[in-house]
Amino acid sequence: MARIGDGGDLLKCSFCGKSQKQVKKLIAGPGVYICDECIDLCNEIIEEELADADDVKLDELPKPAEIRDFLEGYVIGQDTAKRTLAVAVYNHYKRIQAGEKARDSRAEPVELAKSNILMLGPTGCGKTYLAQTLAKMLNVPFAIADATALTEAGYVGEDVENILLKLIQAADYDVKRAETGIIYIDEVDKIARKSENPSITRDVSGEGVQQALLKILEGTQASVPPQGGRKHPHQEFIQIDTTNVLFIVAGAFAGLEKIVSDRVGKRGLGFGAEVHSKAEIDTQDHFAEVMPEDLIKFGLIPEFIGRLPVVASVTNLDKESLVKILSEPKNALVKQYTRLFEMDGVELEFAEDALEAIADQAIHRGTGARGLRAIMEEVLLPVMYDIPSRDDVAKVVVTKETVDDNVLPTIVPRKPSRSERRDKTA
């Protein structure tokens, strides 16, 4: 507590001049004092200056073409999805800036609605990686959540607010920064309604979760338990506004292609009927033709679909794309393993037909790009085990036979140095 100074005078704040009786708290420094009111004022000034510094100016915001080019350096193929995401993300952050300008001006603003994104496509085709790469480019907090772990409030499982806690943690508990972040919700197809018709029994992990997600998708002031878990009345909450949080929800939606083909495939009789063979229907890019009624039939409720106006579809990766994924991106698997071997002083080389064989195995397993690393680990495991203990290896060459026939990679021995040759002849 502040004390009465010598001579009976009350101590005063060195900044505003108020005495210790006029304020709640007076903090002493070397020959100076500051009151709690001045501390609050200084804190507000600093926060405003930091907010102005953190705001991304429109001319600094990457244009859609720049976003797509950045994604091109990391993700092979999926050009339509890249363009869709680039435009949606650019418009989202333009919308945030428009809202900030509207608050500063007195003119009646045109309110811009939020455009969350729904991504459809098979597993291992780059849905999660696209979202992660986007967040890396924009330097915004990014959180990944699994929809299968969620249940509606009051049941065993995670509340939807725990998704927001992951975003706050990704922003180092800076709530203001978290409020302009990106949340990626995976496996959203697993929370589809169990049947097309509403049931009289509760569907707590399906339709119930969709209902619980509606408010945070649209934008609401949510109360988040700081330690996660269930809410209880005696704990403090973190308040976060989700109005400017971009949600990207994604899923494989296995079976949706049949619903689309039933709608798109024209059936009829007579000379004017258009007939498609089963093979033609199977090879059509059905995800590109998805309509809201298809998603409703799949099990998503209309209110949930209405909050996801942007739909981006990814397609199965062919052999050529998988080979490119192995070698071309900035953090390609071949480059990663080459670096690992370099750290042991060994050169690693892949024959072109070896990369094709790895791609063939990934297609055969149905794991897409996600399965490439597992195959590489299987192929390289024996040499990665032996090489650190050896000093006579210069190069390891992986061939088609290594992949297909489970043969050990070719090991090229290191030529002995002059000193080693002299030691042998001595």
Swiss-Prot record:
Coiled-coil residue spans: none
Binding annotation for ATP: P122, T123, G124, C125, G126, K127, T128, Y129
Any one Gene Ontology cellular component term annotated for this protein: HslUV protease complex
Xref: SUPFAM superfamilies: Glucocorticoid receptor-like (DNA-binding domain), P-loop containing nucleoside triphosphate hydrolases
Taxonomy, superkingdom: Bacteria
Keywords annotated in UniProt: ATP-binding, Chaperone, Metal-binding, Nucleotide-binding, Zinc
Record has Nucleotide-binding as a keyword: yes
Residue ranges constituting the ClpX-type ZB domain according to the UniProt record: 1-54
One Pfam match: AAA_2
Binding locations of Zn(2+): C13, C16, C35, C38
Keyword match Transcription regulation: no
Swiss-Prot/TrEMBL GO biological process terms: cell division; proteolysis involved in protein catabolic process
Quaternary assembly: Component of the ClpX-ClpP complex. Forms a hexameric ring that, in the presence of ATP, binds to fourteen ClpP subunits assembled into a disk-like structure with a central cavity, resembling the structure of eukaryotic proteasomes.
Annotated source species: Mycolicibacterium gilvum (strain PYR-GCK)
Function noted in UniProt: ATP-dependent specificity component of the Clp protease. It directs the protease to specific substrates. Can perform chaperone functions in the absence of ClpP.
Molecular function terms, GO-annotated: ATP binding; ATP hydrolysis activity; ATP-dependent protein folding chaperone; protein dimerization activity; unfolded protein binding; zinc ion binding
Record protein name field: ATP-dependent Clp protease ATP-binding subunit ClpX
Family: Belongs to the ClpX chaperone family.
HAMAP family per record: ClpX (MF_00175)
